[in-house]
């Protein structure tokens, strides 16, 4: 999947949890990605993060650090 689309999706998820005002938002975002994203999508977004993570919301970027690196 194109990194731009994954970034947009991750940022939408981050915006939802940010609006909830939860201190645990990064963990909640990571949990959502683990539950609902295909492992290939997680692999692709992590590759994007490793390449600099352009366009990612800071909250989404924090969540990416919590994702397992192997599925």
List the predicted regions and their residue ranges:
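N-terminal acidic leader/helix
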Residues: 1-23
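N-terminal glycine-rich anion-binding loops that anchor highly charged ligand groups
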Residues: 36-39
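Short, charged early-sequence alpha-helical segments and their helix-coil boundaries
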Residues: 41-67
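Mid-chain, well-packed structural core segment of small domains
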Residues: 22, 28-30, 71
């Amino acid at each position: 999947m194109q990194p731009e689309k994954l970034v947009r999706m991750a940022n939408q998820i981050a915006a939802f949890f940010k609006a909830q005002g939860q201190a645990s938002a990064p963990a909640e975002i990571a949990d959502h990605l683990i539950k609902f994203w295909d492992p290939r999508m997680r692999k692709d977004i992590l590759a994007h993060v490793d390449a600099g993570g352009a366009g990612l919301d800071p909250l989404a970027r924090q969540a990416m650090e919590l994702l397992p690196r192997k599925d």
